[in-house]
Amino acid sequence: MFRKVLVANRGVAAVRIADTLKRLGVLSIGLRTTEERGNKYFERFDEVYDLAGDSVSETYLDIDQILEIANLANAEAVHPGYGFLSEN
């Protein structure tokens, strides 16, 4: 079982994944854009990292940036969620 997973998604999908990881005893890592900083749902994650960029293609679809954050956070896996990375 993984001990720490980066969730490469946002909104309801990301929260559901984070909640499931918590029930499994796995630490969750969330990603957010500058616009999303005030959203309360990020409190559901064990760690949160900011994505650089303005558009979806510069943030949630930037695979290199997401993998860089995963390495920085010592994530053992990346969950793509629904849409975004799961479609690429």
What are these regions (language model features)?
Residues 1-88:
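ATP-binding N-terminal substructure of ATP-dependent carboxylate-amine bond-forming enzymes
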